[in-house]
Amino acid sequence: MKLLKREGLSLTEEKALWMYQKMLEIRGFEDKVHELFAQGVLPGFVHLYAGEEAVAVGVCAHLHDGDSITSTHRGHGHCIAKGCDLDGMMAEIFGKATGLCKGKGGSMHIADLDKGMLGANGIVGGGFTLACGSALTAKYKQTKNVSVCFFGDGANNQGTFHEGLNLAAVWNLPVVFVAENNGYGEATPFEYASACDSIADRAAAYNMPGVTVDGKDILAVYQAAEEAIERARNGGGPSLIECMTYRNYGHFEGDAQTYKTKDERVEHLEEKDAIQGFKNYLLKETDANKLSDIEQRVSESIEKAVSFSEDSPYPKDSELLTDVYVSYEKGGM
């Protein structure tokens, strides 16, 4: 088993290639959704995760199906990193009956309980208490499972942020809070809306570790997540990780992004692209043909997901009032 190393961090070649594949799946999926939305094919709103791939993948690389995550309105990347089916995800965004939520959730409410994906959430800050509830279940059942709460920088000013972190600390819950600080709460720069220079600084108020990492460097995210997740899994309690990142697209599709400068977009989209940076690292550590094979497979899987969705039926009218209430036969998390 070949180990790839960098500054004290080691991971297997197999894991590194899995991470590369997941990053490409997220980017390919989001770029395709961007294209389809512009064509007027997709119903509803979409908020794209492209550019932030290193965060979701670097964290979820340490999770298994028994672990759970909560997500945001920008949740496609978290779903893919957690192992959700690409066909089912694309069909859900198309509003088709073969979607993960039978076409009823759409982009902002994709969930897959079998994969521990408790749901994307249209409510800003809606995932904090859900993650705590899942973590409480894991602690009560002594499963050693952990819960991860992904949230954006805009959510760190919501009351549920403080309620969730406080409760997690008081009850010593196995939960990791992951802040995706992409610099803007919709169009408002982070520094205009926060009295703290860093979201991670707020961890001190709740007596938990807090760290800020480069969210464009997947190995930095991977290393920080490994420590926090193992701490939670072994009874050490909650942690807060702030990942400094950048979204390639607007807050939503149709956002003109007039609040961003041309120079910053060039810097992040061309000079600091997370996928290209990880690929440059892998080219020094593994066979380039392996990367090419992954790129080809991912491209084919995205096109397959689109074809599957286009060929799938819409939900029947008789389905309108079904699934109004939760009925999860496996007994929940």
Curated annotation (Swiss-Prot):
It comes from the Bacteria. Induction: Strongly induced by acetoin. Transcriptionally up-regulated by AcoR and sigma-L factor. Subject to catabolite repression by glucose, in a CcpA-independent manner. The gene is acoA. Its cofactor is thiamine diphosphate. Catalyzes the 2,6-dichlorophenolindophenol-dependent cleavage of acetoin into acetate and acetaldehyde. The alpha subunit is probably the catalytic subunit of the enzyme. Pfam families: E1_dh. It comes from Bacillus subtilis (strain 168). Tetramer of 2 alpha and 2 beta subunits. This is Acetoin:2,6-dichlorophenolindophenol oxidoreductase subunit alpha. GO terms for molecular function: pyruvate dehydrogenase (acetyl-transferring) activity. Disruption phenotype: Cells lacking this gene are unable to utilize acetoin as carbon source. GO terms for biological process: acetoin catabolic process; pyruvate decarboxylation to acetyl-CoA. Its EC number is 1.1.1.-. InterPro entries: DH_E1, PDH_E1_Alpha_Subunit, THDP-binding.
